[in-house]
Amino acid sequence: MKKQLQIFFDFLRFCIGSADEIPSSLKEADWKELYAIAKKQCLMGILFDGIKKLPAEHVEMEKELLLRWMAESQMLEKANVRLNDAAIQVSEWFRKKGFRTCILKGQGNALMYPNPYSRTPGDIDIWVEGGDKRVISFVYSISPHEKACYHHIEFPSYKGVEVEVHYRPSFLLCFWHNRKLQKYYERVKEEQFSYRMMLGKQGEIAIPTVEFNLIFQLTHIYAHLMNEGIGLRQLVDYYYVLISDDLSLVRDRVQKELKELGLWKFAGGIMYIMQEVFGMPASRLIVPPNEKYGKFVLNEVLEAGNFGRHDARNRFGRSKLGHNLQRVYRDMRLVKYFPTETLCEPLFRIWHYFWRKSK
């Protein structure tokens, strides 16, 4: 498995364009293993785009597997078209109700991919201007039984697509750092609600700027590490954020914010992964790579898969009690590397319980 994982990484670099040459290790590829890793990490479309660039003699896989991969890639394309339409329509619906919006992650991220239709889509995360009280009150007026948490509220699905309405793009568990993060979002929100892009030929939406995404998506990855687990898909998203624009004008500002938010070492770990796994040149990194943190985070990524769904270490079951026990077990792993965020987690959970009761 370790050998096939290295072949997977070699091929992934070719697929995302950081390596131009077809990796020689591909001659020893077990395509069933590569397929399984791609499926676990939600990178089916990315790898199939790479397969399409290969000469026939390099694709020594069974026809049945190739056809299955092709079919899944075509399904991804259709799903992205559907998600694009949902993002446009939901944004327009809120606009007519008097709310400015910005699509977070998802279809906005897909625009940075060479092939936007190869990204595995999820749901619609839409940042709605107005603050938690106003937005929650509005959603309750539409659908009274939706569940609200600190940063978003559930919303009726649109044509089968799940929608999460955010009044805060993301948050940190440490109260001190979170306060600074929310002030940052308040400071830069105007540009995010105004930065509009076309989604293919289907229509226009507001998406975040690159500078915003460098901070927001890092906090999103961090939150998933603390809560459920992260997969390579989130890191591929961040790779494309890093190469999507000239960072020389924003690097100093981003570094200042990362230090303020207590994310410097975590960012260094992600930069290590960007360099070692994705083959990113040093000129594109936003902070110096941190090998110690990078190896720890990479191990978490490979163990957990997308959203932690494949983590064999989840030994306590899916019940509420099992979830809480798993949380304690995860905190024990994380506290050595991220003590502030980990130790604040129980306090935040208690505070959040009363916050939800008040809504």
Question: Language-model features: where?
Answer:
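Conserved NTP-donor binding/palm subdomain of two-metal-ion nucleotidyltransferases/polymerases, i.e.
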Residues: M1-G122, W127-K359
